[in-house]
């Protein structure tokens, strides 16, 4: 059954236009119609909180190695790359960072830590790394006023002073971009949700090495833990905050 038909059938207090807008995202081509019925009670208005900060998660050089090619063509040589999905997100992410910087929002860069003796929790394949592999990619160079934290595990909060900084600054809302959608982004979203922050994930500014994993995780987080929003929508909300 078409998605629109399902939406009409499950109409309640929330008008149809709001439902269609809430579900108008990249996952529409993979989510079965019955799942929209199951998750209908989660439909709501999305927004950016009044005291937001931007989290830029794991946009380091290692992710872009091998160039703008499908990951399956290059992961044998570059296991950590997200290939074309990483490169496609560069311009939208630059626009997001620029808008947040113009508006004076606190910007936190969270990146992995280089260590040749880093302890791995799994036996998955990893490529040989150098110290600059975990540096922020030049397309997103931090400004002097931005804050950069290093982490050794998936979440931006685990083993970092991030929560203390956010609390001290009175931040109540987080805008999130970076990678990977199913890994470090998701781990950070769940921790942020657990700490009580309102979370907005910018759809065009997060990515994964698997498009299926990317879409499924966005769908799941959107209905449970965060507002997945289009870049244009986020920029419009930010302009409203800056007026």
Label the predicted regions.
Residues 1-53, 70, 98-103, 124-243:
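Active-site-adjacent betaalpha module
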Residues 52-65:
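Acidic-leg catalytic submotif of subtilisin-like serine proteases
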Residues 58-60, 113-114, 153, 180:
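Short, flexible active-site-adjacent loop segments at beta-strand->alpha-helix junctions, enriched
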Residues 64-82:
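A solvent-exposed, charged loop/short amphipathic helix patch at secondary-structure junctions
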Residues 76-91, 126-131:
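A short acidic, glycine-rich active-site loop
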Residues 87-106:
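A short, N-terminal amphipathic alpha-helix
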Residues 105-112, 202:
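Short beta-strand segments at enzyme active-site cores
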Residues 116-119:
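Short catalytic/ligand-binding loop motif for oxyanion handling, primarily in non-cytosolic enzymes
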